[in-house]
């Protein structure tokens, strides 16, 4: 392109490609029929995702990468909040017991049991989230089912 002339669309495309390159990423493109694209794009919008993000989620899921859905995230937050509450309750009971050692320990025992249950729930949830082999199998099953 000479000085003073206007850039062509191919010049702009080349300049954009040069600016967009980010280390560690690969650009993947695919051809979809109009109906496929419309259906896919509609589903992505219903979930509040861009087309690019929806494709990335699908690829990551097929590859077995970690994706946590909103329901799982809410369950985890609820368990963590429960653990925090139980921890405070146990500390208060222990403090009360230190002041008055004759009090009944049944309340402390019940809180400790609930605390253990919450930790077991959290452990189970984390194991299911972090199971790489299960995530890969789930993602590959989605891909195979689509074929």
UniProtKB/Swiss-Prot annotation:
**Keywords in alphabetical order:** Crown gall tumor, Endonuclease, Hydrolase, Nuclease, Plasmid
Please state what class of enzyme this protein is. hydrolase
* GO annotation, biological process: import into nucleus
Supply the InterPro entries for this chain: VirD1 (IPR009933)
Record EC number: 3.1.-.-
* Domain of life where this protein originates: Bacteria
Signal peptide positions are none
Alphabetized NCBIfam families for the sequence: PRK13858.1
What is the official name of this protein in its record?
A: T-DNA border endonuclease VirD1
Which organism does this sequence originate in? Agrobacterium fabrum (strain C58 / ATCC 33970) (Agrobacterium tumefaciens (strain C58))
Q: What gene is this protein a product of?
A: virD1
